[in-house]
Structures are given as C-alpha cells and as structure tokens.
Amino acid sequence: MFITNDIRYIGVNDHQVDLFEGQYVVPNGMSYNSYVIIDEKIAVMDTVDQHFGQEWLANIRTELGERKPDFLVVHHMEPDHSANIDVFMNAYPEATVVSSAKAFGMMKQFFGTDYADRRIVVGEGDTLALGKHTLTFVTAPMVHWPEVIVSYDSCDKVLFSADGFGKFGALDVEEDWACEARRYYIGIVGKYGKQTQALLKKAAGLDIAIICPLHGPVLTENQGYYLGLYDIWSGYKVEREGVVIAYTSIYGNTRKAGELLEQKLLENGCPKVVVNDLARCDMAEAVEDAFRYGKLVLATTTYNGDVFPFMKEFINHLTERSYQNRTVGLMENGTWTPTAAKTMLKMLEGSKNITYCENTVKILSALSDASRAQIEALAKELA
C-alpha cells in the first residue's frame, strides 16, 4: 500500500481473531500495521502478530525486491506488534534493531536475547538518519506500556504513533473511524489520560501531515479532527451531551424502571439517551458510552448484600479507567434492605469531579407510584 513515495504499508489483516487482547469483541477483525521507509538505508517499522509472520515477510520482500532492510524500529513491545522480531532478525542477520532501553529488556524476556551486538538504543530526541528521511524519537511512556516510543519523519511529515490513534477493525472493512477508535482508546489506553495528554503536547510541536498507527487506517488528512478527539478522550472531557442508562435486572423490574426513565428523559427534551443492559450488551461499548456522554444513570439490584455482578464489573471498568468529570444518577431495587445505591457510591468514591443527582430512585421489588414519581424527578434533573 502506497503512503508516500518512500513509505509503504506492509501490515496484515486478521479476520480469525474473535477477542482482541482476550476480551474485546472485534466483529470486523483487526489490522496489525507495519511500514517500511525506503531510502539510502531501509527501516521497517514494527512487526505483526505471531500468526502472520510469513505473510509479513512476504510483504517486505514484495516492496523491497532484492534490497534488504537495514533497521527494524520497534515502537511497542506488546506481542501483537513484536512477536516477529526474532523471525525478522534471523531472516535479516545484517539488520539492526532500534528501540528504547525498556523495550530491549522486554525482548530479553520474550526472546531470550536483547540483541546486544545488533542494536541501537534510542530515547527522547534521538535521531536515525536513513538518507533524506530522518526519524526523530519521542518517548511515550504508559501510552500504554512503559517502553513505548513514537517517531516522526520530518521529510514526509509522518508520525508513527504506536498504539496511539489506533482502532478496532481490519483495513478491508469500511466503517466510521471514531466509533471503534473511541472503544479502542477507552478500553485499552483510557486509564492513561495524563500520559496521553503529555504525548499530545509533544505532538503539538510537530508538523504532522500523516499519522501511521499500529492498528487501523493510516490517517492522511484532517489531523486536527483526530488530535481533537484524542484531547477530549484523554482529558476525560464530555464529547456529547446525553444520558447513558446502564442497568442490570433479574426479573425485569429494574429494566422497566430504566425504560420508564428513558421515556421521561425524552419527554423532557434530553438530546440523547443510550440504554445498556449490562448482562447482554458488549461491555466495552457500554464503558465507551459512559465516557462519551456527560451523564450516567446506574440502575441495579441489591444482590448478596452487594450489587449485581454485571454492575460491579461495569463500575470497576469505569474506575480502572479514571472515570471523572461526569454527572451520575442512582437507581436501586431491593425486596428487603436495598443497599445498592450506597454500595455504588462507595465504589465510585475515588472518582474525581463526579456530581451526584439529588434525586435517587428506590424501588421496592416493583415500580410503584412513589418510585415512578422519583423517576420523573430524576428525569427532570438530568434533562
């Protein structure tokens, strides 16, 4: 795939994977991106997942013909990008691997060698001259592993962004970028907003025309749009006004309460309402929704003196990813001693800048006139 006159795509698509990282549903597969810069010296940028090593090597040979790579640049050591380092180094015994000091420590763990006689260790501001192309390296620790670096080619104004600006989905499937990029960012990188913000500040000083991520499409235009969304996501800002109702329901009574709240919110002019049944929806999508919109209602039952397991999992996902700067409403259901609201408050107590609704809904087994009135009041407060 042509990117610029000297930069080509040599990655692969994976339609065999059902759960990315063992947890994220990827109905449209994944891409594992790799690139090659062809100059006086040749640099291959990252490898691919372990199952695609031979396809990837064939892609390299197709682009290079009789020439051989001089460098393998490793931005990130997660196995979906690093699994074929040793395969590459054996295929090209004259090549040198270029990466961060922490990455070489990880190579020792993964492959039993840190390529001490065939390596270049780079850090912040270091450069690698290829000819007319020169790569400048920028450290990006904890976006989202500690060894991560990104690199910038000033000749073609290309940022090789590691997992930054990645998305779910293979490249032979057309779909909206933001939806699956948001789910990818919130799920995988979302905990590290502060570190992502630091990287964005570094990127602001670069003249970026093209972004080459390790997953998803190459971004060749409208860079301000992508950088703006990353600023929203990593800054834990509200992307869109609306209310997310996340509920669990054992016998349908809490579900009915959630549906009534949805109806009342729309009647009161709420611009957008999203409802997620946490037992049946894609949990990662529900988490994505909670970070996308400004308001969240948690509706669940008291269960074994706690909250229903899917709600506990959902809240844990939120707090693990530093959920903050939102308005939260609570709805609890119980037949005796309902305590779910109190438990959810306790689970969220470490979250920053959460505004709790004054109106909390208490359902005693099934909807009543009293709980319907509480739902009406909550809807007016949220809308």
Feature map (PLM): residue ranges:
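Conserved beta-strand hairpin/beta-sheet module of binuclear metal-dependent hydrolase folds
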Residues: 2-60, 150-153, 157-161, 254
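Active-site-proximal loop/helix segment associated with metal-binding centers of metalloenzymes
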Residues: 144, 148, 156, 164-191, ...
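FMN-binding flavodoxin-like domain, especially the glycine-rich phosphate-binding loop
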Residues: 171-211, 215-218, 260-276, 286-383
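Structural motif
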Residues: 41-43, 71, 133, 157-160, ...
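Active-site neighborhood of phospho(di)ester-bond hydrolases with catalytic His/Asp-centered motifs
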Residues: 45-47, 69-77, 97-100, 159-163, ...
